[in-house]
């Protein structure tokens, strides 16, 4: 995953979301694939979709992670708010989407 971090850093010009976070939203909404909901698909494609190990290393272990923010939702909110993971209760804090549930996406 370390080789992907420079690419991730440059992609922060466009916010990121993990495929696993998208899957969690799809499951909650009872959908099987992103194309089943055109609105959700459009929201997801406003961000760069990346693999979960990359976002875990960059966001979960990043310097901006502070105690009390909650569980990172595998979506960034540098330029665009938490759009996709907001559907599962995530909000923006320090450029990362968090929720207070005890589940990691």
From Swiss-Prot:
Propeptide stretches in the record: 10-69, 100-105
Example of a GO biological process term: defense response
Keyword Signal among record annotations: yes
Pfam families: Cyclotide (PF03784)
Disulfide bond annotation, renumbered to this chain: 73-90, 77-92, 82-97
Record PTM: This is a cyclic peptide.
Top-level taxon: Eukaryota
Cross-link (Cyclopeptide (Gly-Asn)): 70-99
Signal peptide from the UniProt entry: 1-9
SUPFAM superfamilies named in the record: Cyclotides
Keywords: Disulfide bond, Knottin, Plant defense, Signal
Similarity section: Belongs to the cyclotide family. Bracelet subfamily.
Domains (record comment): The presence of a 'disulfide through disulfide knot' structurally defines this protein as a knottin.
Role, per record: Probably participates in a plant defense mechanism. Has cytotoxic activity, active against a human lymphoma cell line with an IC(50) of 3.2 uM.
Protein's UniProt name: Cyclotide vibi-E
Native organism taxonomy: Eukaryota, Viridiplantae, Streptophyta, Embryophyta, Tracheophyta
């Amino acid at each position: 995953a370390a080789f992907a971090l420079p690419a991730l850093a440059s992609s922060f010009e466009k916010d990121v979301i993990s495929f696993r976070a998208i899957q969690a939203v799809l499951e909650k909404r009872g959908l099987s694939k992103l194309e089943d909901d055109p609105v959700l698909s459009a929201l997801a494609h406003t961000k760069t979709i990346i693999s979960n190990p990359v976002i875990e290393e960059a966001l979960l272990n990043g310097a901006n992670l502070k105690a009390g923010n909650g569980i990172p939702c595998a979506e960034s909110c540098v330029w665009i708010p938490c759009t996709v993971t907001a559907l599962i209760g995530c909000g923006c804090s320090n450029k990362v989407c968090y929720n207070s549930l005890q589940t990691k996406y």
